[in-house]
Amino acid sequence: MSVSELMQIKGIGKAKAVQICCILELSRRIAKQKARERLDFSNAETIAEYYMEDMRHLKREHLVLVMLDNRCRLIRDKVMSVGTSTGSMVSVREIFKEALDSRAASIVILHNHPSGNPSPSREDMKVTKNIMEAGRIIGVELLDHIVIGDNSYFLSLIHISEPTRP
């Protein structure tokens, strides 16, 4: 809930609404940090669940790079691009610079569709293919490209983009 939404509740002014938002955010961060330490990021569903609440209600498209070690444990993540309500731009070069700087063995790309529909666009498919090909050359595997929709929907693009994996 936002400060303005909380202020609509009788008896909650701006100061109290800000306090409540701060408490909610702190609780979310603590819970996420504890969960992060136990997660195996080799599973698309696990990754989608981990990022779902942060991404599904965003009004603009965000592309997140998830960098993993050789045991599929999270090294770090980074928002690589914030676009419009219909798209975002990021270069393959920027993605792999971050991955190499973090010494990632593999990566996962996530982005949200503000429309709530996780169906991939042609551009989503093209970007996935380009990142996959570059990763093969560089030696940093793209494990998945996940599209986050609304209402707990997500779509894994890795099998759509490459029907026959070696």
Positions of the model-derived regions?
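Short acidic, glycine-rich surface-loop motifs adjacent to enzyme active sites
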Residues: 105-115
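Surface-exposed, charge/polar-rich loops and edge strands
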Residues: 115-117, 123, 136
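Charged helix-capping and loop-helix junction motifs
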Residues: 91-93, 122-130
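Histidine/lysine/aspartate-rich catalytic loop segments that bind and position anionic ligands
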Residues: 51-102, 106
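Conserved small/polar residues in nucleotide/adenosyl-binding loops
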Residues: 158-164
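Alpha-helix-loop-beta-strand connector modules within alpha/beta enzyme cores
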Residues: 127-139
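Long, charged amphipathic helices and adjacent flexible linkers at domain junctions
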Residues: 27, 31-51
